[in-house]
Amino acid sequence: KFGEGFMMKEVSADDFDFEQRSMMNCFYCGKYGTNWRCPPHLPDIDYERMFKEYDHLAFLWLDLPYGDDDYDEVRSESSVRLHRALLALEKYLWDHDCSTAISFIGGSCKLCRNGCGKDRCNNPYMSRSPLEATGLNILKAAAKNGITITFPPDGSIMRLGLIAW
């Protein structure tokens, strides 16, 4: 349903390591403060506790190859494809009586081609926050679940998000 290349694996919040240093990386992003679903605009909640409140968590990811001439295009496309797939999962869960289902994307929200609205999010019902903005060390969590993320990317870009229900 999501298209070619997607993988999914149910995971446990017990495998999650939350680190201040993961959140600090957001501060050094060139888009810091301009994306309504990224820090410093996220709610101040205990994300570790929140994830443990869910009965089910699953990583959803895709890995897309890129060349020297299409890195930026693949980088953006991979983010949007993952985002839309996670939204489809949320809708499915909503339609099947899971009203608290929520997803977190891989990287910043890129739904708006011209960037975020100046005063508010242009797509408040569809935009999602990056998983790394919660403080989760994604590389460690993925490794604990047998998922290898090569960083920095070398020939392919992997986008990993999370669905919770």
Walk through the language-model features, giving the residues of each:
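Catalytic cores of enzyme domains
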Residues: 4-165
